[in-house]
């Protein structure tokens, strides 16, 4: 274990689970601790890796800390789910799960798995009024299935883990928790670890309450919680770190899906979507679905953060995303709503989408990643199967409220009607400078680098003069720093500003920063190919920098006699993994 954690001077047990970091098809271990919080508890964290800096997510938790003599010291006085991340990276983080009390459930038909006890196989619930209690430290290696039962409870602080079951065993060991055609279901407190498919599926059920569940999924299709064709379901106080989607609503021929709420949760997606309605929506109605008070702390592969994807016959309506905070999500779309055919759909007839609300959404970004790299999208299917009445209210992107689809980074395509973008106490006639970022000249190779000029053009189409300070910025940060400039533009006039750049090969986004939030959001994407020659000693040194501003050792790259040569000038042994596509 990398971490040692003390609560009020008492050593805590540190657990470990598999997660999917990067690159593709790999796994690593993430460490976590759990403890009861009665009052203000002092937590001291030590790491085998030297702690130079730290961040504690979600930022909305407002947890203050100090680093003293290489240790992180913080206080916790309430139930929280926190990611402690050191030295500017989310790799090698520590999760903290603090809870108030343990729920042991009703004691009729009581199945108890005690501490340090390990059971294997499928635990099948076949009777009404059954409770499965998994004590902290206990593990069920397998899955839990309940069919056609009323009043069932699954609770405790222990694990349901499928690490012993391979992909080929999915026929019998797919989902860790599978609840089918049941009523009055409570699932509370447990940990789901390394599911072979969706971590938890609720299908054809009524009156379900899921709370304080921690889900770790490192495999393909390891969704967090899928609510399928069910009614009156509350999902709250959840943590997910999964390969696939975190919170999902579907309909799989088990009736309408309605009155579903996901709330007060922390989501970390290593590959796919944090919140999704779809794609399979085989029901007459999918309605009254709400996602509220949710923190997305990481999601970095470009998938939509909030999506509705529809290819079946359902009428999808009254979907709300409210009070969502977004932190580290480089490349992701904020919103994606589409009606389209897909490989997952079976209905011959298409449906429609009505009355969708996104409100109080706050995109925070990170120090090195504070812009949206992908535009959002809304697209219907036909005149008959269309999308109507989509409202965006109080959408804050890096401190600036969007008042137009363009400011929102929203592309609106065919068969869409009734889009509104508003914000409290702001009017659509707010004065904003229109902006352009263009290549003045093509970037030319120069001694292993590229040199070129980027032009910024600001247009003042208002009837008042506008002035202030702005900055031309590049992500990822590489050889160039932000360049500040002053603007003073008369009504109906434009000004241009040129920036001479020297860049290494790589992919870049050029964008503008403005503290007054009066310059519209715009960015320019550019890709500069690597320069390769035969003589490696003549090649430039490449410093690899990713979107997190993580830097690797410098290397030289050459191609000679159909061989790829990679050289590091350092005398130290260098390990690397090469991927080709």
Language-model segment annotations:
Residues 1-438, 463-464, 487-490:
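Extracellular/periplasmic carbohydrate-active domains that bind, remodel
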Residues 35-37, 442-450, 556-559:
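Short, solvent-exposed loop/linker segments at the N-terminal edge
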Residues 41, 450-456, 562-564:
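Structural beta-strand segments of beta-rich domains
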Residues 98-115, 527-547:
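Low-complexity, Pro/Ser/Thr- and charge-rich linker/hinge segments at domain boundaries
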Residues 458-462, 566-570:
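Asparagine-centered strand-capping/turn motif at beta-strand->loop junctions
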Residues 464-477, 571-580:
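Short acidic, flexible loop segments centered on an aromatic residue
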Residues 478-505, 581:
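Intrinsically disordered, low-complexity Pro/Gly/Ser/Thr-rich segments with frequent PxxP/GP/PP motifs
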Residues 503-543:
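Terminal connector regions
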């Amino acid at each position: 274990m990398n971490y040692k954690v003390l609560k009020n001077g008492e050593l805590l047990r540190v657990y470990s689970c598999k997660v999917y970091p990067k690159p593709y098809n790999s796994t690593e271990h993430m460490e976590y601790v759990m403890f009861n919080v009665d009052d203000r508890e002092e937590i001291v964290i030590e790491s085998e890796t030297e702690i130079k800096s730290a961040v504690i997510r979600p930022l909305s938790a407002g947890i203050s800390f100090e680093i003293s003599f290489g240790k992180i010291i913080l206080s916790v006085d309430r139930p929280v789910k926190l990611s402690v991340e050191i030295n500017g990276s989310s790799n090698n983080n520590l999760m903290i799960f603090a809870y108030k009390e343990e729920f042991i459930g009703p004691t009729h038909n009581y199945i108890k798995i005690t501490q340090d006890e390990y059971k294997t196989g499928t635990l099948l619930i076949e009777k009404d009024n059954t409770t499965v209690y998994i004590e902290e430290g206990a593990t069920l290696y397998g899955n839990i299935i309940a069919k056609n039962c009323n009043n069932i409870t699954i609770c405790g602080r222990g694990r349901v883990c499928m690490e012993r079951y391979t992909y080929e065993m999915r026929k019998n060991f797919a989902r860790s928790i599978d609840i089918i055609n049941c009523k009055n279901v409570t699932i509370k407190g447990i940990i789901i670890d390394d599911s072979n498919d969706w971590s938890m599926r609720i299908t054809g059920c009524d009156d379900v309450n899921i709370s304080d569940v921690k889900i770790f999924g490192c495999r393909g299709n390891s969704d967090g919680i899928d609510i399928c064709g069910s009614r009156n379901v509350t999902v709250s106080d959840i943590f997910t770190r999964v390969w696939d989607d975190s919170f999902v609503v579907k309909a799989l021929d088990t009736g309408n899906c309605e009155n579903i709420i996901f709330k007060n949760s922390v989501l970390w997606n290593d590959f796919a979507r944090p919140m999704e309605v779809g794609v399979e929506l085989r029901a007459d109605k999918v309605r009254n679905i709400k996602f509220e008070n949710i923190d997305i702390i990481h999601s970095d592969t470009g998938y939509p953060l909030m999506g509705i994807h529809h290819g079946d016959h359902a009428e999808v309506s009254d979907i709300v995303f409210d009070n969502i905070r977004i932190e580290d999500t480089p490349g992701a779309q904020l919103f994606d709503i589409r009606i389209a055919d897909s490989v997952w759909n079976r209905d011959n007839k298409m449906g429609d989408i009505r009355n969708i609300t996104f409100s109080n959404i706050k995109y925070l970004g990170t120090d090195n990643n504070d812009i949206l790299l992908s535009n959002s999208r809304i697209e219907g299917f036909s005149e008959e199967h269309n999308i109507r009445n989509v409202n965006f209210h109080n959408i804050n992107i890096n401190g600036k409220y969007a008042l137009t689809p363009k400011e929102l980074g929203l592309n609106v395509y065919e068969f869409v009607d009734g889009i509104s973008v508003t914000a409290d106490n702001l009017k659509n006639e707010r004065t904003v400078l229109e902006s352009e970022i263009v290549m003045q000249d093509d970037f030319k190779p120069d001694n292993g680098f590229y040199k070129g000029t980027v032009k910024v053009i600001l247009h003042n189409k208002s009837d008042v003069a506008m002035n202030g300070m702005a900055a031309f910025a590049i992500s990822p940060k590489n050889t160039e720093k932000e360049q500040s400039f002053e603007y003073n533009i008369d009504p109906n006039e434009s000004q241009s500003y040129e920036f001479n750049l020297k860049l290494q090969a790589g992919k870049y986004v050029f964008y503008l920063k403005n503290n007054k939030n009066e310059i519209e959001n715009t960015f320019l994407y550019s890709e500069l190919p690597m320069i390769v020659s035969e003589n490696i000693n003549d090649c430039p040194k490449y410093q690899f920098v990713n979107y997190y501003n993580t830097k690797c050792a410098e290397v030289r790259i050459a191609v000679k006699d159909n061989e790829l040569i990679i050289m590091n000038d350092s005398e130290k042994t260098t390990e690397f993994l090469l991927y080709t596509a």
